[in-house]
């Protein structure tokens, strides 16, 4: 009901825009392997795998490493709360209050992700774990909006919808591949999974260079 009211309000506030017809040929069509598309899809797929492996392993990790602590369900739920809060705060700070360029958001966010995954695996204490989770939230809050914005800006107006569709289709890859990639690594050693994610995030720094992403 409230969603319907919000949709009606947004519709009433939309201003009419004169459409400009542009002749487009076959060369203007994009595909997932277009130069302006595939680097973003690779970035999104890696980011999705890192985030999905984290989400699916939080409960296991806390239980395996901090099983001697009391109120494990509370500790696990606090992890999700800290991750969500830090992500929301990061998105507000770096996209609204103190906006940064997309390239800077992608670069700094990737560095924070790599650093936090490493500290999470190396310092196996609950305090460092929570601190790493908050830094992870900041990193996710910087990279995710910058990625979608950069992809949109790299396309012509008539191709922005298709590009957004490609990006949306890649995001679930992390949850699909985590049981086959992340969990076997976790079974060997819980810390190895986060070292692996840290290495993947270092590759994001390489992918986010301006020569690869048009940001």
What are these regions, as identified by a protein language model?
Residues 14-41:
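Juxtamembrane intracellular "pre-TM" segments in multi-pass secondary transporters
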Residues 104-118:
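Structural signature of the two symmetry-related core transmembrane helices
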Residues 159-187:
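A late C-terminal transmembrane helix in Major Facilitator Superfamily
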Residues 142-155:
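Intracellular juxtamembrane helix-capping segments at the cytosolic ends
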Residues 203-215:
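Residue-level detector of conserved catalytic or cofactor/ligand-binding positions
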Residues 89-102:
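Helix-to-loop junctions at the C-terminal end of transmembrane segments
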């Amino acid at each position: 009901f409230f969603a319907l009211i919000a949709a009606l309000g947004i519709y009433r506030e939309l201003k009419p825009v004169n459409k400009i017809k542009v002749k487009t040929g076959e060369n203007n069509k994009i595909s997932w392997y277009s130069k302006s598309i595939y680097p973003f899809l690779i970035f999104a797929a890696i980011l999705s795998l890192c985030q999905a492996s984290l989400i699916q392993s939080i409960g296991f990790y806390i239980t395996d490493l901090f099983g001697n602590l009391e109120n494990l369900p509370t500790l696990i739920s606090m992890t999700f709360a800290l991750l969500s809060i830090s992500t929301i705060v990061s998105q507000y700070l770096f996209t609204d209050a103190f906006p940064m360029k997309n390239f800077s958001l992608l670069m700094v966010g990737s560095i924070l992700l790599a650093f936090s995954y490493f500290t999470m695996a190396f310092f196996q204490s609950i305090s460092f774990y929570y601190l790493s989770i908050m830094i992870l939230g900041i990193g996710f809050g910087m990279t995710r909006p910058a990625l979608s914005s950069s992809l949109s800006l790299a396309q012509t107006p008539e191709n922005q919808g298709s590009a957004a569709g490609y990006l949306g289709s890649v995001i679930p890859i992390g949850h699909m591949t985590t049981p086959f990639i992340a969990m076997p690594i976790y079974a060997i050693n819980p810390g190895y999974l986060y070292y692996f994610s840290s290495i993947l995030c270092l590759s994001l720094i390489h992918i986010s260079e301006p020569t690869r992403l048009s940001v």
